[in-house]
Amino acid sequence: VIGTPDGNLYLNSTGNPGMATAGSGDVLTGIIAGLAAQNIPLIESTIAGAYIHGYSGDIFSKNETQTNLIAGDLIRNLPETLKQVLP
């Protein structure tokens, strides 16, 4: 769940329990920062970043297992994730 100061709530439908691993939050922060650095408004960067982050974890869990996931796997899956998510 992503909440904004004005009270809006956004629910991210991607991701899985295997992503609760060391460094996963750092990857999420990097994705959000990368989007924000492209002058995408911060709330949109946060919503998109959370979706992309979770989708990357979902790709890994489909190809491997949730229990083996490490933060580097999320980064390695970003090119495939972006191909599938972005128009």
Regions found by a protein language model. Name each.
Residues 1-87:
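Small-residue (G/A/S/T)-rich helix-start motifs and N-terminal tracts that mark the onset
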